[in-house]
Amino acid sequence: MSRELTLQERLDGEAGPDPLRQAVKKAVAALAQAAIDISDLTCRGALAGITGEAQGRNTDGDVQKDLDVRADQIIRDALGALPIAVLASEEMAELDILNPGAPISVAFDPLDGSSNINTNISVGTIFSIMPTPPDASAAFTQPGSAQLAAGFVVYGPQTSLILTLGQGVDIFTLDRVERVFKLTGSMMQIPADATEFAINTSNRRHWDLPVRAYIDECLMGADGPSGKNFNMRWIGSLVAEAFRILVRGGIFLYPGDARDGYEDGRLRLVYEAHPMAFIIEQAGGGASTGRKRILDIVPGSLHQRVPLIMGSIKNVRRLEDMHTGPNVALEANAPLFGHRGLFRV
């Protein structure tokens, strides 16, 4: 049986002598070490003093948990001495400009899904690595297509690191005995078509017509236009949803809706949508707002929110067609939601 390649070995093989790739290698290695430390905390839970209690709100108005703060500091400590121009954390209001002449800049969500801590559901870390432009303060005003690398970590039954360096997607699993990440999935490919969707259906009444139409079509199953029966999944953890899509396909939707503050969804472009879109596209999937490719969007602000639809390419394209074509009219005729259906609207 062959020995599993470690993350460090994979990074060494990819970097070569190029200074930019060397900087990316060092940043990813440091983020991986930080993830091991965060994994230790999440695994110990209350034994490590992790209560899941609110510590206030971050600058964007979201409740900030105790582990959010600790995870943020762990990552900052890991990256602080590296050749990095700018750090941007979802937990902080402003950029942290470290070394304006350094070749890369790193954005991260230190603990995505922290509201799940008390219920023992998977949480994670998400990161994006950008080239530093001449004006370092503009590092995160570049489109997502400029990313050099992106990844996320799932702290679940296993701790898994999902990584793209722009040439496919690999999965590394934490070996807790040796305390290193080892390659367990290489060149991941998302099935082009799948029969699982993930969305919080309790918000249906607030959705735009195209989203309603698409979900109604899924619920119609084999009796509807798709001719297939779908299953619904909703974990409420972006990293867990993305991992499931990577290994077995499906579509994830966090759309904008009619509620105050939800017009553009709730996910951040820089910290969540851009890195997830890069990973999903590198695995053969699609990522869109419904009307625009996520990786084409240029951030207008550091904490900008954006609707996110991602997953199997045919499923994503179908929903995009519903945003731009005549199929929205189908929504009113969906049998499950029509005047003779199970649910009246």
Swiss-Prot record:
Species the sequence originates in: Nitrobacter hamburgensis (strain DSM 10229 / NCIMB 13809 / X14)
Q: Per UniProt, where does Mg(2+) 1 bind?
A: 90, 109, 111
What are the names of the required cofactors?
Answer: Mg(2+)
Q: Please list the residues that bind substrate.
A: 112-115, 200
UniProt-listed HAMAP family: FBPase_class1 (MF_01855)
The entry's family comment says: Belongs to the FBPase class 1 family.
Principal location listed in the UniProt entry: cytoplasm
Q: Where in or outside the cell is it found?
A: Cytoplasm
**Keyword line:** Carbohydrate metabolism, Cytoplasm, Hydrolase, Magnesium, Metal-binding
Q: Kindly give the PANTHER family that the UniProt entry links to this protein.
A: FRUCTOSE-1,6-BISPHOSPHATASE-RELATED, SEDOHEPTULOSE-1,7-BISPHOSPHATASE, CHLOROPLASTIC
Q: What cellular component terms from Gene Ontology apply here?
A: cytosol
The gene coding this protein: fbp1
Subunit field text: Homotetramer.
**Which is a Pfam family this sequence falls into?**
FBPase_C
Organism lineage reads as: Bacteria, Pseudomonadati, Pseudomonadota, Alphaproteobacteria, Hyphomicrobiales
What this protein catalyses is: beta-D-fructose 1,6-bisphosphate + H2O = beta-D-fructose 6-phosphate + phosphate
User: What EC number(s) is this enzyme filed under?
Assistant: 3.1.3.11
**Matching InterPro entries, A to Z?**
FBPase_C_dom, FBPase_class-1, FBPase_N, FBPtase, Fructose_bisphosphatase_AS
* Protein residues bound to Mg(2+) 2: 109, 112, 272
The protein here is known as Fructose-1,6-bisphosphatase class 1 1
Q: Its annotated pathway? A: Carbohydrate biosynthesis; gluconeogenesis
Task: Give the SUPFAM superfamilies listed for this entry.
Answer: Carbohydrate phosphatase (SSF56655)
Q: Give me the comment on cofactor binding.
A: Binds 2 magnesium ions per subunit.
Single GO biological process annotation from the record: gluconeogenesis
One annotated GO molecular function: fructose 1,6-bisphosphate 1-phosphatase activity
